[in-house]
């Protein structure tokens, strides 16, 4: 008998900007990712202030889900998906972000997507803002640095809540909101890069602006949750964090303290606001050490307290080690920083693979918050090559996912309330961090390459059939 609950939400996850394409079709405006060029593991993608004719912008076509959604959702249904995590592209609904009236053609597209999901018995799990900030809001307001964006976000939320109230039950307010705790989050998450052109992960850091922007996102999230709970009691509202599990490198007390502070900053700062409705006890010292002063309106504290989430979701790909010692090798490709763990292997992109770390993380999060959890991103980005038979034999991906599902099962036995699992990039898509197609996660291979070529045909990998069996047995048969 499976340890996972009978209504466990098995599925997969994607983001609008990474797979929809059709970037300027049917009234859609440009979002921040539409201004990002392609890149690779060794060459950073750039954000530009205008579209350069000599550069390739992978989100413009991506894998063209916009015109392939029926085919793709049918493939998800063939695997047996119970849920599909996707996002709504803000600029399909409000091209600049500040309009009062929505773009009807954009709304109709998501009607079709959600209707197709329902036809196949798939429950949509919708991220309201998944790194898809309207670029016009960056140009005019410096993104979330301006409190004005709370009102624009609320208008967007009210529009999609009312439109899809009978089609979507599960909502996430922001994707990986704790990206705002890190310098790389300024482009994709907070959008606080007005006038900046350069490497997308290398914008000059301004902690004051970044953390003020994050506060505005917290208030916007809370307002959206309060509104949803008041008007649509059937909705379940969640948060989403990039969970950064780390370990102290040694038993040196300095390493232990450094790791504790890293966990506080990367995970609990945002998690506490979302789940407990207030900034954690350590926030004031953190602000002081960063030279930050958060401007808050008198009503913000009450808003945060009332606008707490119903469930907590997170991405989990890797772990890292933290040390105060200077003679230790860092981790390549790990956005959260840290140093190498000698006990772990790494992916082609240098991300250290740690299945037991997922069990550890689930226990840490559940022990702190005691609300239902969901792993909404997990997976192995790899260079997939077709065999002589024309099929991708991705046993390495199956091994990765199997080992992580095994540890999720152990966490459930530990007593963790786990409601679902949606591996990332269930169909190959554009990488958010590097802007490349070569970093493939999917159960479904898409014939699209980094130079923009490819006929966009879809083909099942070995992992497709394996995951279908996992879902059919509710996680019992992992062979």
Question: What spans do the regions from the language model cover?
Answer:
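Catalytic domains of carbohydrate-active enzymes, especially glycoside hydrolases
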Residues: 64, 68-89, 123, 306-312
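Active-site mouth loops of central-metabolism enzymes
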Residues: 54-68, 145-147
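A short acidic, glycine/proline-enriched capping/turn motif at secondary-structure boundaries
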Residues: 82, 91-93, 131-133
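Glycine-rich, proline-tolerant flexible connector loops at the mouths of alpha/beta enzymes
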Residues: 88-102
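Active-site region of glycoside hydrolase catalytic domains
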Residues: 1-53, 77, 96-98, 107-479
């Amino acid at each position: 008998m499976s340890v996972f609950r009978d209504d466990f939400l098995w599925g997969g996850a994607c983001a609008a900007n990474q797979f929809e394409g059709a970037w300027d079709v049917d009234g859609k405006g440009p979002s921040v990712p539409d201004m990002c060029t392609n890149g690779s593991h060794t060459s950073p993608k750039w954000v530009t202030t205008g579209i350069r004719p000599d550069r390739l912008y992978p989100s413009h076509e991506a894998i063209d889900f916009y015109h392939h959604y029926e085919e793709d959702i049918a493939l998800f249904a063939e695997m047996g998906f119970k849920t599909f995590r996707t996002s709504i592209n803000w600029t399909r609904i409000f091209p600049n972000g500040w309009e009062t009236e929505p773009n009807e053609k954009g709304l109709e597209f998501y009607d079709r997507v959600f209707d197709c999901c329902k036809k196949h018995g798939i429950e949509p799990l919708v991220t309201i803002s998944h790194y898809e900030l309207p670029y016009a809001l960056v140009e005019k307001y410096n993104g979330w640095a301006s409190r004005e964006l709370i009102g624009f976000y609320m208008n967007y939320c009210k529009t999609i809540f009312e439109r899809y109230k009978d089609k979507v039950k599960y909502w996430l307010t922001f994707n990986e909101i704790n990206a705002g705790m890190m310098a790389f989050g300024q482009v994709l998450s907070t959008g606080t890069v007005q006038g900046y052109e350069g490497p997308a992960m290398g914008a000059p850091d301004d902690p004051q602006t970044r953390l003020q922007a994050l506060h505005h996102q917290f208030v916007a999230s809370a307002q959206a949750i309060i509104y949803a709970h008041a008007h649509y009691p059937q909705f379940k509202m969640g948060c989403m964090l990039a969970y950064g599990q780390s370990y102290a490198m040694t038993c040196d007390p300095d390493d232990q303290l450094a790791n504790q502070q890293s966990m506080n900053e990367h995970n609990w700062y945002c998690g506490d606001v979302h789940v407990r409705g207030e900034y954690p006890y350590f926030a004031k010292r953190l602000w002081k050490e960063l030279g930050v002063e958060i401007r808050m309106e008198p009503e913000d504290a009450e808003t945060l307290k009332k606008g707490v989430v119903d469930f907590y979701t997170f991405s989990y790909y890797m772990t890292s080690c933290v040390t105060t010692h200077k003679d230790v090798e860092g981790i390549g490709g790990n956005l959260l920083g840290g140093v190498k763990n000698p006990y772990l292997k790494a992916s082609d992109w240098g991300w250290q693979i740690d299945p037991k770390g997922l069990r550890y993380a689930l226990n840490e999060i559940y022990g702190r918050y005691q609300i239902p959890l969901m792993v909404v991103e997990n997976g192995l980005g790899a260079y997939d090559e077709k065999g002589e038979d024309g099929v991708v034999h991705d046993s390495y991906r199956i091994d990765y996912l199997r080992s992580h599902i095994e540890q999720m099962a152990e966490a459930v036995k530990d007593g963790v309330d786990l409601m679902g699992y949606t591996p990332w990039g269930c169909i190959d898509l554009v990488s958010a961090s590097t802007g490349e197609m070569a970093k493939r996660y999917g159960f479904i291979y898409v014939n699209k390459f980094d130079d923009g070529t490819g006929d966009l045909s879809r083909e099942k990998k070995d992992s497709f059939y394996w995951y279908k069996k996992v879902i059919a047995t509710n996680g019992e048969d992992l062979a």
